Regions:
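A short, aliphatic-rich alpha-helical micro-motif
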Residues: 69, 155, 291-295
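FMN-binding flavodoxin-like domain, especially the glycine-rich phosphate-binding loop
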Residues: 173, 183-218, 223-224, 265-278, ...
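Short acidic active-site motifs
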Residues: 87, 285-290
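Conserved beta-strand hairpin/beta-sheet module of binuclear metal-dependent hydrolase folds
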Residues: 3-64, 152-155, 159-163, 259
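Active-site metal-binding motif and surrounding structural segment of the metallo-beta-lactamase
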Residues: 55-101
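Metallo-beta-lactamase
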Residues: 4-8, 46, 102-220, 224-229
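Active-site neighborhood of phospho(di)ester-bond hydrolases with catalytic His/Asp-centered motifs
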Residues: 49-51, 72-80, 100-103, 161-164, ...
């Protein structure tokens, strides 16, 4: 892709990756992604905000060459992960006088990952500024969004926040700016769930800090630029809050139909009680969509058959991921079936040790669900409704 002007003197010089379909060998990328790097030309100095993934280094260098960028004074690295920093070693060769501007923790990780010499760094602290002449960069240290060394960079005169991974999302698009806020909301919510949700306690404070800034744009490291910052800031404020919604998410697997019959009955019972239900058959589920669904609900009910003596392996995987993502759910339960015994319920309950939930009485059946099983599911639906009413969310 060619470079594009964001505002006078500020340019997008990154790369689009329409074909990438997985990130960290874990996160599906149904819309591809972008690696956003930004060039800022001041009256005295030129700065580059982040680099791109090593697989796209030629696109970044080509953009800089096409723009006749003969000198870069500062390369600001907001985040040490290689999709942000991976082209840094090459750029330091091409621009031998460039100084890497970042915080001490990021310098430490960059040195470990990329072996960047100590003498190439200028270390900044929270609130420090850097003059480019007629433009000023201000830095905010924001650990655990989503690594411990993350920072944000604010261009004062143009009121642009280069927000690193915060407020962004994976999408490869030829549009420089967000054009469809409804679609952007869904992609950003998915990205938040996959990347940011485990750190919502820290992020809550950063959202409030950013809200106090005069902002014309938020320019993230992934996805198009946001010219209406209030849209994404309000969304984040909702996601990181402690409030939950009158929703139940049901991730499940059914090997011979028994667990699926239970899921269908429970789904109907919850809907009849005015509760929104989102079932996910894990054999066909995009794990990113499941993560997104976990942002809001008050309750999760896990459906599993028993494999040998424990839950189905795909249920184990989904439960492990949910535990790592630490959603703000308040209640959890387990439904499912077994042939001769096992400890599926106990195993799942132990796996949710990072999620502060009240475990509601499970419903397990030997073989096919019978009338007693269906009554147990109705009882579980009533228990969930009661708990939701206590939270005043019905």
């Amino acid at each position: 892709m060619v470079s594009r002007e964001v505002v006078k003197g500020v340019f997008w010089v990154g790369a689009l990756d329409f074909d990438r379909r997985i990130f960290d060998e874990l996160i599906p990328l149904p819309e591809g992604t972008s690696y956003n790097a930004y060039l800022i030309r001041g009256s005295e100095k030129t700065a580059l905000i982040d680099t791109v993934d090593p697989s796209k280094e030629e696109e970044l260098t080509s953009n800089l060459i096409t723009m006749d960028v003969n000198q870069i004074d500062y390369i600001v690295i907001n985040h040490a992960e290689q999709d942000h920093s991976g082209t840094l070693p090459l750029l330091l060769e091409v621009y031998p006088n460039a100084v890497v501007v970042t915080n001490e923790k990021c310098r430490e990780i960059l040195n470990a990952l990329l072996d960047i010499p100590h003498d190439r760094f200028k270390i900044i602290k929270d609130g420090d500024t850097l003059s480019l002449g007629d433009r000023t960069l201000e830095f905010f240290i924001t650990p655990w969004t989503h690594w411990p060394e993350t920072q944000l960079t604010y261009l004062r005169e143009d009121q642009i926040l280069f927000s690193c991974d915060l407020f962004g999302f994976h999408m490869a698009t030829s549009d420089l700016f967000i054009t469809d806020e409804a679609a952007a909301y869904q992609s950003a919510k998915r990205y938040y769930a996959e990347i940011m949700m485990p750190f919502r306690g820290s992020i809550r404070g950063y959202v409030e800090k950013v809200k106090r800034l005069p902002l014309s744009m938020i320019a993230p490291s992934h996805g198009p630029i946001n010219r209406h910052p209030a849209f994404i800031l309000d969304a984040y404020a909702d996601w990181v809050s402690d409030s939950v919604k009158n929703e139940v998410v049901i991730p499940y697997v059914s090997m011979h139909g028994s667990t699926e019959m239970m899921v269908v009955h429970l789904t109907k019972a919850l809907i009849a009680r005015g509760i929104t239900v989102k079932p996910f058959n894990l054999t066909r589920t995009d794990i990113g969509e499941l993560a997104k669904a976990l942002v809001d609900p008050a309750t999760v009910v896990i459906g599993t058959p028993t494999v040998l003596f424990g839950p189905h392996p795909q249920v184990v995987y989904a439960t492990y991921l949910a535990n790592m993502l630490k959603p703000k759910i308040r209640f959890a339960s387990v439904i499912g079936s077994y042939g001769w015994g096992g400890k599926a319920v106990e195993t799942i309950a132990k796996m949710l040790d990072h999620v502060n939930v009240e475990v509601l009485e499970p419903v397990m059946v030997k073989g096919l669900p019978d009338e007693a099983t269906l009554k147990g599911l109705d009882r579980l639906a009533n228990d969930i409704l009661k708990k939701h009413k206590e939270l005043n969310i019905t």
